[in-house]
Amino acid sequence: MGAPALLWPSLLLPWLTVLFGQPPGTLAQTQVCSVNQTIFRVEENTTVSEPLVNIFVPDGLHVTLGPLSTPYAFRIEGKDLFLNVTPDYEENSLLQADVECKRGDAVVVRLEVFVAVLDINDNAPKFSFEIKTFNVSEDTKVNTTVIPETQLKATDADINDILVYTLQEVTPNASKFFSLEGVNYPALKLDQTLDYFKNQNMTFMLLARDTWEENVEPSHTATATLVLNTLPADLRTPWFLPCSFTDGYVCIHAQYSAVVPTGHKLPSPLIMSPGPIYAVDGDQAINQSIIYSIIAGNTDGTFIINAHDGNLTMTKSIPSPMKFTLLIRADQEDMAQYSVTQAIVEARSVTGNPLQFSQSLYYGTVVLGSEAGTAVKDKTFPSEILRIQAQYPGFPDLNSAVTYRVTNSSEFMMNKDIMLTAVPMEEARTIRVEVEASNTVTKDTATAVVEIQVSERERTPTPPEAGGTTGPSSNTTMEAPLTSGTSQRPATTSSGGSVGPFPPGGTTLRPPTPASSIPGGSPTLGTSTSPQTTTPGGDSAQTPKPGTSHPTAPTSRTSTSLMTTSSRSDSTQTPKPGTSQPMVPIPGASTSSQPATPSGSSPQTPKPGTSQSTATGPISLPSTGAGEQGDGQRFSTVDMAVLGGVLGALLLLALICLVILVHKHYRHRLACCSGKASEPQPSGYDNLTFLPDHKAKWSPTPNRKPEPSPKLAQPPLRPPSPMSSSPTPPSSTPPSPQPKASGSPKTVQAGDSPSAVRSILTKERRPEGEGGYKAVWFGKDIGAEADVVVLNEPTADVDSASASGSEGSDDDDPDQKKTLRFGVDADNTYI
């Protein structure tokens, strides 16, 4: 054991000599370069101005940077190692300094210093696009990934950053259709079925953030725009138009019908109802072409349909009445979708439905001097072309085979249903032309007469001034025709015999006779008038309704029309109140007068607040409107408002004065009716005269004997009874005192008849010492409205016969008691 242990030192010595180049004794004595730290950590973007490390360099040695050092990253100043650059993790995450310790040119020792660059969040994420457009089909299934993550992913130079994605809608409600599959996985998926008609395109904003939360620092965000276009899908079948019902998604197809004559083959396509056979692609954005075909019901191949336009034509005639139910199919050109509907064609006999014109006599007009080829205008409606048409009632298909020609004149020719001049019209006259209509299928013919008036063009009235009184305005003028027939455009007349027909808007009728001056006044400068007349026994013109305006003052150099009425009523009706009736003509305008009718009935005077215009035959309806102040008005709206305020104040003062006068003259009656009548009747008394508070204050007079004739005496303390032989209504002044007759009440003798006046006496006598009965006399000739005066008068003596005769007369009539009580309480007041 001891011998091997002694051999180890002798064996290790040569190896140490080779490794260190010198014996172990000299290693302990030699010093080399050294550093106290070889690895450093520095955050990126940090500038280090202090030396990283101090190098220990023994005497006789020096240090330099070796070739293995990071270029330009370090420098050595003396014995200090400095960082020469600002580190950037994205450029170089590890910096190396190779320090060589040399003795002369020989390297004694090599030192390595490392700088690890720490990453910080200093870079924002980036998308590979700013705006990207994607197309999504309308029939894409829900939860399908429409855009993969690789096309939407953003990148960040900060390798350790985790990006968070957010999808924000720009188009309202777009977020209901699309969403991201995850906050860190930006794949786009479909959440709801698309509708091309509602959302043809949607826009989103895609955000990528390099922090989980938004409010931390530092935090960076990148944005990009996504545009999603919805592509239409072939989801709907062809639609036969017009749809009976449609909401844009579903169409209830139209069903067609037609009527054809038996025994005839129509050369042109059938006229279908409600319209021609026509189908469109239900997906309007795709709009595939449609191909038509008949799949059933075409007995004996009677009909054929055009595959491209759907026109249905006959291949042969139908011998007898029958009905065809054709099934029409419409296919898309790509044969992906189709629809079916039915067309019912009924064959009827044309017998009993001859070819005929709408009227036997037409009225046309041509302007004098018209060139050849000028269309004849309708005389009733001169702004419209006269159309002469012959038809088969109930067979519209036969009408297309009708041709027209002029049979008796070379001055006119027919272009379909329009008559044209063949030569210039150089003479004013009236021409009657015969037109023949013939059907090329049935060979039927019909004739009609056209009366054409060649006349000069009438001057068009100037339109009314803006804001002024609105008058009849027109673009063309015409005379009032008296036609026996009707034109193509029906002219309506009211049942009451009112004028008609009415021309359309834009025409005005002008009277054929010159206007006369205004009756009862001097004519205004530049004005003319037109009389408004009625025929014998004439019908009445219609009454203007309240609130309407019937102006009689058109603008300059125009004349109002005559209004002639037919015969059924007795007088023209009076315009109702509430409408304005301007009767002052504007200079250069015309007014109208209203003479009495020949039948003795006269037009009534228009009521205040109405205005009325006149016209002949077919009249144009004048337009009304709230006019502003025109050139011919004298006062502005402000002036009229001030005038209205002044008139209102005057009316208020007049009402106040009237109330004062009524109160002054009738207050005693008002006080009687309102104050006395409402007082409660006292209980326990038949007559208010015997109440203690209202007892008479006079002294009793001695009884006197009756005298044959009354004599004048001193006026009594209380007024005597005003009754006389002839009752008279009361006056506003109190009755004058009358001389009192001696004796019983002989003062009331009316008409010298005992039945003219009757006496009503009460049972009760006055207290002893006052004497007398209480009596009231009523005349039979006094009406209910006459006033009665109740007089309490003391008498000296009363005849026993009068007292006994009136004993019980007052008991049986309580109404009379009430009358007596009221009269006594009023004290000589008329009741």
Curated annotation (Swiss-Prot):
Q: What residue spans carry the Polar residues bias annotation?
A: 473-491, 541-554, 573-582, 589-623
At which residues is glycosylation annotated? N36, N45, N84, N135, N143, N173, N201, N287, N311, N408, N475
GO molecular function (one):
cell adhesion molecule binding
Q: Where is the composition biased (Low complexity)?
A: 505-540, 555-572, 797-807
Signal peptide annotation:
1-28
Ordered alphabetically, the record's keywords are: Calcium, Cell membrane, Cell projection, Differentiation, Glycoprotein, Membrane, Phosphoprotein, Repeat, Signal, Transmembrane, Transmembrane helix
Which BP terms from GO are recorded?
A: cell adhesion; cell differentiation; homophilic cell adhesion via plasma membrane adhesion molecules; intermicrovillar adhesion; regulation of microvillus length
User: Which Gene3D superfamilies does UniProt cross-reference here?
Assistant: Cadherins
**Locations of Pro residues compositional bias?**
716-738
Q: Where are the sequence repeats?
A: 541-571, 572-602, 605-614
Q: Where is the Cadherin domain?
A: 53-125, 128-240, 252-357, 358-459
Q: Where is the PTM Phosphoserine found along the chain?
A: S699, S721, S725, S736, S753, S802, S804, S806
The biased composition feature labelled Basic and acidic residues covers 761-771
- What does the function comment of this entry state? Intermicrovillar adhesion molecule that forms, via its extracellular domain, calcium-dependent heterophilic complexes with CDHR2 on adjacent microvilli. Thereby, controls the packing of microvilli at the apical membrane of epithelial cells. Through its cytoplasmic domain, interacts with microvillus cytoplasmic proteins to form the intermicrovillar adhesion complex/IMAC. This complex plays a central role in microvilli and epithelial brush border differentiation.
Q: What is this protein called?
A: Cadherin-related family member 5
Species of origin: Mus musculus (Mouse)
Its taxonomic path starts at: Eukaryota, Metazoa, Chordata, Craniata, Vertebrata
Q: What is the name of the gene encoding this protein?
A: Cdhr5
